[in-house]
Curated annotation (Swiss-Prot):
Top enzyme class: hydrolase
Annotated function: Probable GTP-binding protein that may be involved in cell development.
UniProt similarity note: Belongs to the TRAFAC class dynamin-like GTPase superfamily. GB1/RHD3 GTPase family. RHD3 subfamily.
Compartment list: Endoplasmic reticulum membrane
Name assigned to this protein: Protein SEY1 homolog
Positions annotated to bind GTP: 59-66
Entry coiled-coil feature ranges: 388-410
This enzyme's EC code(s): 3.6.5.-
Alphabetical list of HAMAP family matching this protein: Sey1
Keywords: Coiled coil, Endoplasmic reticulum, GTP-binding, Hydrolase, Membrane, Nucleotide-binding, Transmembrane, Transmembrane helix
Compositional bias per record (Basic and acidic residues), positions renumbered to this chain: 867-877
InterPro entries per record: G_GB1_RHD3_dom (IPR030386), P-loop_NTPase (IPR027417), RHD3/Sey1 (IPR008803), Sey1/RHD3-like_3HB (IPR046758)
Amino acid sequence: MVAFAGGARTEDAHLIDDEGQLLPVNGIEEYLFTALGASRGGDALHRVGITYHVVGVLGGQSSGKSTLLNCLFGTKFQTMDETKRRGQTTKGAFISRANFEVLRGDDGEMDAGASALMESCAGKSLPLFVVDFEGTDGFERGEDQSFERQLSLFALSVADVLLINMWAVDVGRFNAANMSLLRTIFEVNLQLFSHDSYTKEEKPTLLVVLRDFTEVETRTHFETVRKSFDKIWDNIVKPEAFKNSTIDTLFDLRYHVLPHFKLQRAAFDKETAKFRQWFYLSTCDEYLFHTRGMFRGVPLDGIPSYLSSCWEMIRKSKDLDIPTQREMLARHRCLEVKKQILQLFTEFCSNYTERLQRGELVTHLTSLLEQDVDDKLRDFHQQTRLYRIDIVRKTEAELEEELLKVELKLVGEYAKFISSKVLEELETAVSGTVDGALRWLLHQAQSIPFLSAEAGDAGGGTEHMSHLKSVERASSNDVYITDNETCNVLVHSFWKRLCRALQAEIELLYCDFSQQHQRQRESQTLNLYDRYASLVAEDPALQEAIAHFVSDAVFQKVSRRFASMAENAAETIHQAFEGVLNRNQDGTVRFFHTTKALQRIEPQARQAGLVLLGCLLYYRVKVVADRVVYKLEDTDGLSRAAVHLLGERRKLIVRENSEEQKFFLHYATISEAPRYPIGAPVAETDSADTSDNVVDRDCVLLSQQAVQRAFDLYTQKCEFTMQLQLRSIEGEKQNLPAWVLPVLLLLGWNEIWYVLSSPVLLVVVVIIAAVFLRGFLLTQWAIFEETGPTCVVVGVRVVVQQIRNIYKALVPMMPDDVKSNVARHRDPGSFSDVTASAVGTSWPYAAAEPTVLPPSTTSATLTRRLKKEEEVPTQKE
């Protein structure tokens, strides 16, 4: 047997051998390409789609099935040579494509229908494949009907039209007419129809061909065949759903007769030519293919996998479900196409990756990628449009998602390259933000007033106050009771302020789809992107990706800084103590002239250090997704990558669940370590507890032992710093003995008289004396500020300030004087501070003066020094 496609001659294929082995998928594909006259690996099968048909034939052995197919379709199936033997010729199943080139009339001309079909075949459309199945009731198989049943089920799963080859003289008989084969066909098709997903449109055409018909009237034979079919149908066991159904529910029954092949050859050929029109001439009244495509809806490029899957299920004696097989085929084919397209897109993106590694940056990268993604999706839809729509849509969505992942990976590599430059520009700003927040914290911490014993008794618990009273009884010094609630509120405010400030820096990098705000941001972000500014401005997805990388990097940088501060907690809070001790709240350097001033500021400085220790206990910043909702018109025209990245924007917030709000140090006094929050549930790193109301162990920077150790070292360092300050104060005291002035007047009388008698020298001496007098008065005023009554000091300050304002209003300052004054009184905290611009809140005690504390000692060294100062006047008296 041979098959032709546009005149090309090809050998047929042994689809199923006599041992029941199906031709491999690759072999079936190779045959189909050859039958279509196309080279392997092209899209010929895909172009055919479902516009093809399959015709199969079943019947008894040696009943002339192959001969009938050769005459009808021009195939070259092997036929039996009666002169040599009688027996089995077709073993298993053979497949071939219909060849109408050799089908000509007696005059040698091809009939009109065949000519039309030839033109159709030449146009690569509506191919017709013919399957010749092994005959039944053969001596070779004996009583084994399992293979017969398997072939019947396979034929019903693939053939649009199933020819039943039957001798006319056997009509009315059971065994001779091979009615057992019909019973098998009915049963297996009933098995197929039993599935819920089976549709009534998927019933094959059962065409009964009565061979060697010599009578004139055909109606009697057709009625007899129908009665035989009905009797078989009534005797088989049917499912409940088909109890009252007829055979027409499962089959479209058609009948035809043909004259004797040998005795009436001319009539046989004539009737065969007419019969052939049933298969290709759509204008024929008996045309069999009412739909343009294969009735199972399996595309030709999926037929190899479909046949393999069906035959495997049949051979394993499993329940064959054609819709399920089509679903499996659709899924397999869609996954195959998806894999191919994904590989092509990955190779496409790898070219840009290589260019990036060479330092070449491509403009409009996302637009190029989006265009290729659209092309790939159209290609996928084109190759899978004939399969089940729900599976195609699902796989297409999966493909689009995976293509987006590959695209985002490439955009991420570009963003990572550019974000390294952006981080260099932002590093100073981020460090300044953290420094500004710490300065604000210490500024507010030293303004928190201490509680009196009564206030502490009213605000604290019984256990806490009993502890304070025991401390008071054990020490003769005053106890500075820390306002625990206010300190913890300040710690929380510090983290909120830091989050807002960092978020303000990061938001400059994100796209703003409002044109008004976009123009305002362009000038601010130009310096951040440096030479990549124009590249980023033209690609919103790249800008979003850069912002994501920078957000994560800023978060990691700040977290590492606080982790480093926590590792050296004692040194960190001691530096804060020194900063508060040595600088005024306006940032100017503080000089101490008396020990009383040092005594007054030391508790505030120690409290500021302890508040900072509370900030180092737990890292309260976390990154969450900022679910920004944009209008459709705002995101119209954006790429998939940009829209996806919009949904993953980062936002820095403060950790403040119910347990984290309780996870603060408990302050009692400045002379004892803060109590650790032991009762809070802490989630382990690998814990299965996914509750939100827990404390994250990864964010706990200080353990209970670390807090105690840091406090002990902090106390020692503060004592040492106080000793250095006391030595500095003592070194500045240079009082001359009382007898020095009279001796100077006595010995220098002549020089004094000479100066008084000389006007020039007198003026010079007066000027020098005025300068020294001014310095002396300023020094005495500083001492008075430190030791005098607060009400008097504040009153004098107000009067002096009013006099200065009046003087400035009457006598304008020169430009040089203005510059020098600004330089002299510049506040170190007034430099570019992101926290000041990003957050408009302030601490309630920020405007208040430092609390005036009663003169008392806070350390052993300072106590001894004060006692020594009090004993000196007594000894002189």
